Amino acid sequence: EVRALAAADKILAPNVNTVSMLKKNGISSDMIPVGIWDYRMNETQIAKIREISHAHKKENEVKIAFAGNLNKSEFLSVMEIPSDVRMELWGKLDPEREKTMADGCYYHGILSSDEIPFAVAEMDYGLVWDGSGKDEIEGGLGEYLRYNNSHKCALYLASGLPVIVWSQSGMAYFVKEHACGIVIDRLSDLDQV
């Protein structure tokens, strides 16, 4: 892979973390960080998202969306969720795994990519996180988050939500640069949201 990348004149890298990693591995090609993936929606969907996102905000309660393959998101079973925070979950989740979810997690099933933006638009934030750790990013999936552009991030932003991302993730620079969310070091920082 390194040889193939080294032969390229230009590389579209997912983000600035990936650019740094490739340079450390000897790639000297010109690199352009993409920044974020898109999330396709038509004008009607965008208008509906705008209506939803302004109508469902409640005081004294923070609703955080998390969508994706919940079976691989081990942190959802061990994290400590502040009492004024609700983790609203969508995605694939085996019944046995659902029983192990942390207090404060509420599962809503699986929705299509056309339906999910409307459900998460009712939330206050979207969480981009992975790994097995109770508080910090751990494991292979967590390490992957360091270099990956998460489609979750694009979904949440397209749904009108600010995002919550790990400070060392591939999305952290984008979130800071565009002031479109909160960058945290560990899950216990959710109490500051």
Residue ranges and their predicted role:
Residues 172-182:
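Acidic, glycine-centered active-site loop in nucleotide-sugar glycosyltransferases
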Residues 2-31, 43, 169, 173-174:
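A short, active-site helix/loop in glycosyltransferases that binds the activated sugar's phosphate group
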Residues 17-20, 71, 163, 170-171, ...:
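Alpha-helix capping/helix-boundary segments
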Residues 39-122:
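Conserved catalytic-core segment of nucleotide-activated headgroup transferases in glycan assembly
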Residues 13, 165-166, 184:
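Short beta-strand scaffold positions
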Residues 182-188:
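Conserved acidic donor-binding segment of nucleotide-sugar-dependent glycosyltransferases
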Residues 9-10, 125, 162, 180:
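Well-ordered beta-strand positions
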Residues 114-159, 165-173:
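Nucleotide-sugar-dependent
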